[in-house]
Amino acid sequence: MGRLFGTDGVRGIANKELTPQLAFELGRAGAYVLTEGSHRPKVVVGKDSRISSDMLECALIAGLTSLGAEVVSVGIIPTPAVAYLTRLYKADAGVMISASHNPIEYNGIKFFDKFGYKLPDKLEDRIEEIINEKKELPVPTGIGIGRRKESLTSHRDYIEFLKSTIDTDLKGLKIVIDCAYGASSTVAPILFKELGAEVIAYAAELLGEKINVGCGSTHPEKLQQLVVEHKADLGLAFDGDADRLIAVDEKGNIVDGDHIMAICAIDMKSKGKLKHNTVVATVMSNIGFEIALKEHGIKLIRTKVGDRYVLEEMIKGGYSIGGEQSGHIIFIDDNTTGDGEITALKLCSIMKHTGKKLSELASCMTTYPQVLVNAKVKNELKEKYLEDEDIKREIEKLEKEMEGKGRVLIRPSGTEPLIRVMVEGEDYAKISQMAKELADLIERKLN
């Protein structure tokens, strides 16, 4: 059996890879590891709207309660809400059933510790070890078996918390919200209406068969159209579990995670709230983002791709904002994970405080053209580019030519016999040529 836990919990095609049996075993092993049998654990369980979430929830809760865990079921709710409610309800852990932005046939199971952080690798390894080795676990009977309790206040608790993360109402703003037929449908329309905004909700029904299909943060085309049609101030697109946000300005242009982070970081710095004047992002954030931050005296630290690496760096350095171009943004003083609703509120509150349109705010950075070319290289040779002097010299030469207004990024594919060559810079034709020549050189040298 391959490793169960990826960078974002256990994920796979529901009922085929992520089966009810596996969900049951994860529940049992998770309940045991979180307490090592020392006390009766309390676990918050939430889910997104996809069809398979009910099936997996029943199996997971059966596993948890069979080890004596008390389960607080919070229903269809955003992933970041589970992280927050785990802390609020003083639970031992939280579990979210969701495959985030993935297609409907997928689902996932993600654990949070009692502080609302994703489980550290060593605890995930321990859960996996128990499942793989079929370790014998306690079998409580009678009153030793746990129960499931449905929370009737979870959505209200989360909405009130979200309101507390900004210091203004949103009266006067007209907002189109795309809920991706997902978990934000239960929160976002209510939240923004209660804050005084005029709300036009799209894809806001809990239709599991439509989650993320032609809508949400990965497909914002319909939202762009609706913002212009309704003459709205902005559009907000969440993904299936609302841990990420992509915005649309009043002209119908996309405002991605890089732009949102730039807007928020510049605003935070002006208020003295940007810790160490630093933002954490991944290697995929555009060079234009880095240049915009530098112009405002803000440092950028880059990590590997994946929000868990961003979060690790934020905790290590004590930084207050970090995220990904995809719209997965963490405001660590507010929540322990990416939270699309918090990101949306921060953006709207900056518009309210400054009186500026979103297109004006987004003009703080220019997205530089980006070219991606694949070099075909055998899997066993993919890491060798690091040792080749000619390749290293060529990369240095290209970056020198761009004089700080461009960059070269080399990333071996994790799944295919390819090395991805990405070049960003001001002149599209020039960087296209650079990327092609560098990919050709890599193929020649490594094959």
Swiss-Prot record:
It catalyses: alpha-D-glucosamine 1-phosphate = D-glucosamine 6-phosphate. Activated by phosphorylation. The keyword Magnesium applies. Mg(2+) binds at residues 100, 239, 241, 243. Binds 1 Mg(2+) ion per subunit. GO terms for cellular component: cytosol. The active site is at 100 (phosphoserine intermediate). The modification Phosphoserine is found at residue 100. InterPro entries: A-D-PHexomutase_a/b/a-I, A-D-PHexomutase_a/b/a-I/II/III, A-D-PHexomutase_a/b/a-II, A-D-PHexomutase_a/b/a-III, A-D-PHexomutase_C, A-D-PHexomutase_C_sf, A-D-PHexomutase_CS, Alpha-D-phosphohexomutase_SF. It comes from the Bacteria. It is an enzyme of class 5 (isomerase). PANTHER family: PHOSPHOGLUCOMUTASE (ALPHA-D-GLUCOSE-1,6-BISPHOSPHATE-DEPENDENT), PHOSPHOHEXOSE MUTASE. Catalyzes the conversion of glucosamine-6-phosphate to glucosamine-1-phosphate. HAMAP family: GlmM_B. This is Phosphoglucosamine mutase. It comes from Caldanaerobacter subterraneus subsp. tengcongensis (strain DSM 15242 / JCM 11007 / NBRC 100824 / MB4). The gene is glmM.
